[in-house]
Amino acid sequence: MRYADPSANRDLLGNRTLLFIFICAFALVTLLQQILYSKSYIKRGFQFGWQRGDQQANWTGLFNDSDSPTEQNITGSSSRYFEFYKEPLEFNSTRCLELRQEILEVKVLSMVKQSELFERWKSLQICKWAMDTAEASLFKSTLSRCCNAPSFLFTTQKNTPVETNLRYEVESSGLYHIDQEIFKMFPKEMPYYRSQFKKCAVVGNGGILKNSGCGKEINSADFVFRCNLPPISGIYTTDVGEKTDVVTVNPSIIIDRFHKLEKWRRPFFSVLQRYENASVLLPAFYNVRNTLVSFRVKYMLDDFQSRQPVYFFHPQYLSSVSRYWLSLGVRARRISTGLILVTAALELCEEVHLFGFWAFPMNPSGFFITHHYYDNVKPKPGFHAMPSEIFTFLRMHSRGILRVHTGTCNCC
């Protein structure tokens, strides 16, 4: 005879009970981690964009350590938890100094997750950027000693006399002999001098510019640098502006899209006309491959009786700039044209603003963006160190040396 076990259908600390206990424990641990480690809840919290005209709110837990006069707490019991800002905080306010330090304490990009860097950067946007004159002057003095853009940014008759054997930047064993014909292509001396322009805009081509509405602010700058013949007319003008004082041309564009200017030249001439009287800047002495095609741009504009000046980077300047940024941790086979222009702008301008510089697939709010504002073509991997360059710019922004624009603009 078989006897039934009266406890057979009971779940006394059985599988279901253990599973329930495990789920509860996991949830509790997760909650504790959020409370203890997530700065989103205690330190920086949720914030709303100034561009939409909303108030800024910081979840501050049970403390308020800010002494800025622009901050006002909500009345009532909730004032212990929320802190609202009706306008941006001063860059040197106590709260902003803390937020700036949170960027600066990250020495290398690999120290934090990308999402954490974005969060710190978003938090800093409640602060109204202001140039730190002492920091900027110190940084510019180091550039003056190492690179000296006012003397060596372009190849000139003054810094490269006739009969000079000019050494290429990359192919260090190669020399280019400067004869009388080539010498005549160079300007007599640098057309710009130190701190000549009050406010400069260096415009990159990043997808972060799309739908930014920054065109008017870019156009309001005293001097505007652009990289590699980007589109600026039609649907793009609202976001990127159209004012251009210097535009660089990568010779690979001429080689791939315009057949080295060996046949038809008018299509390329038409492209340059979109930049009106902007100076055209080429790396003719980067390597042997670039030289002849760069010279052809000068010949072409002369043939069409264009007034657009054509300048060539001085290879000594390019080498010096590369060594300088390498010493600051930017390691790449070649630094980007954008970084070269930013370096030059810091010497030629009192105040430097960057637009379109972003090297991540998402914007600071976590939304996917295209690589460029006009297409989504990715660069060859391993050639530039764009994330490292952008990270360096964010640190320079935090130090008050230059300003990086990554949001929408409300200028003018």
From Swiss-Prot:
<dbReference type="GO" id="GO:0000139">
    <property type="term" value="C:Golgi membrane"/>
</dbReference>
<dbReference type="InterPro" id="IPR038578">
    <property type="entry name" value="GT29-like_sf"/>
</dbReference>
<keyword id="KW-0735">Signal-anchor</keyword>
<dbReference type="GO" id="GO:0003828">
    <property type="term" value="F:alpha-N-acetylneuraminate alpha-2,8-sialyltransferase activity"/>
</dbReference>
<keyword id="KW-0472">Membrane</keyword>
<dbReference type="Pfam" id="PF00777">
    <property type="entry name" value="Glyco_transf_29"/>
</dbReference>
<keyword id="KW-1015">Disulfide bond</keyword>
<feature type="binding site">
    <location>
        <begin position="250"/>
        <end position="252"/>
    </location>
    <ligand>
        <name>substrate</name>
    </ligand>
</feature>
<feature type="glycosylation site" description="N-linked (GlcNAc...) asparagine">
    <location>
        <position position="92"/>
    </location>
</feature>
<feature type="binding site">
    <location>
        <position position="228"/>
    </location>
    <ligand>
        <name>substrate</name>
    </ligand>
</feature>
<comment type="function">
    <text>Involved in the synthesis of gangliosides GD1c, GT1a, GQ1b, GP1c and GT3 from GD1a, GT1b, GM1b and GD3 respectively.</text>
</comment>
<feature type="disulfide bond">
    <location>
        <begin position="214"/>
        <end position="409"/>
    </location>
</feature>
<feature type="glycosylation site" description="N-linked (GlcNAc...) asparagine">
    <location>
        <position position="277"/>
    </location>
</feature>
<feature type="topological domain" description="Cytoplasmic">
    <location>
        <begin position="1"/>
        <end position="16"/>
    </location>
</feature>
<comment type="pathway">
    <text>Protein modification; protein glycosylation.</text>
</comment>
<feature type="active site" description="Proton donor/acceptor">
    <location>
        <position position="384"/>
    </location>
</feature>
<dbReference type="GO" id="GO:0006688">
    <property type="term" value="P:glycosphingolipid biosynthetic process"/>
</dbReference>
<keyword id="KW-0325">Glycoprotein</keyword>
<feature type="glycosylation site" description="N-linked (GlcNAc...) asparagine">
    <location>
        <position position="73"/>
    </location>
</feature>
<dbReference type="InterPro" id="IPR050943">
    <property type="entry name" value="Glycosyltr_29_Sialyltrsf"/>
</dbReference>
<keyword id="KW-0333">Golgi apparatus</keyword>
<keyword id="KW-0808">Transferase</keyword>
<dbReference type="InterPro" id="IPR012163">
    <property type="entry name" value="Sialyl_trans"/>
</dbReference>
<keyword id="KW-0812">Transmembrane</keyword>
<feature type="glycosylation site" description="N-linked (GlcNAc...) asparagine">
    <location>
        <position position="64"/>
    </location>
</feature>
<keyword id="KW-0328">Glycosyltransferase</keyword>
<dbReference type="GO" id="GO:0006486">
    <property type="term" value="P:protein glycosylation"/>
</dbReference>
<feature type="glycosylation site" description="N-linked (GlcNAc...) asparagine">
    <location>
        <position position="58"/>
    </location>
</feature>
<protein>
    <recommendedName>
        <fullName>Alpha-2,8-sialyltransferase 8E</fullName>
        <ecNumber>2.4.99.-</ecNumber>
    </recommendedName>
</protein>
<feature type="topological domain" description="Lumenal">
    <location>
        <begin position="38"/>
        <end position="412"/>
    </location>
</feature>
<feature type="disulfide bond">
    <location>
        <begin position="200"/>
        <end position="349"/>
    </location>
</feature>
<keyword id="KW-0443">Lipid metabolism</keyword>
<feature type="binding site">
    <location>
        <begin position="336"/>
        <end position="338"/>
    </location>
    <ligand>
        <name>substrate</name>
    </ligand>
</feature>
<comment type="similarity">
    <text>Belongs to the glycosyltransferase 29 family.</text>
</comment>
<feature type="transmembrane region" description="Helical; Signal-anchor for type II membrane protein">
    <location>
        <begin position="17"/>
        <end position="37"/>
    </location>
</feature>
<dbReference type="InterPro" id="IPR001675">
    <property type="entry name" value="Glyco_trans_29"/>
</dbReference>
<keyword id="KW-1133">Transmembrane helix</keyword>
